[in-house]
């Protein structure tokens, strides 16, 4: 059997971590690099709620070693969970069809565009 098991958590910004695990008074911008020295990966849980912008993602990559991995959780619309239109990237909102309750209906076109955005 071959393969690799990586160990990490679902966030580097969890309030419990901030309070209990990180060094006291460690600035927020230094938490991800500090985390990446101790774990091999992190789950991007925030991507379930809103697609992060490209500059933010590049900043995360730059703050971590080359071998560090990000496990990206797909946006809730792609996993067929209820999603408000404002959780979509602004340029994709006009293509979104909504239910009577203002929730995104995942059309094939939106699914393709949203999936492409996540892997850019």
Can you describe what each PLM-predicted range is?
Residues 1-120:
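Residues lining hydrophobic/aromatic ligand-binding pockets adjacent to catalytic sites
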């Amino acid at each position: 059997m071959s393969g690799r098991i990586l160990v990490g958590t679902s966030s580097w910004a969890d309030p419990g971590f901030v309070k209990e695990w990180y060094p006291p008074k460690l600035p927020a911008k230094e938490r991800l690099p500090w985390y990446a020295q101790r774990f091999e990966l992190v789950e991007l849980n925030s991507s379930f709620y809103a697609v992060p912008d490209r500059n933010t993602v590049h900043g995360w990559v730059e703050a971590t070693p080359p071998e560090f991995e990000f496990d990206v959780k797909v946006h809730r619309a792609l996993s067929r969970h209820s999603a408000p239109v404002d959780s979509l990237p602004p340029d994709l909102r006009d293509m979104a069809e909504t239910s009577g309750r203002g929730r995104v209906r995942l059309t094939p076109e939106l699914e393709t565009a949203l999936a492409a955005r996540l892997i850019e």
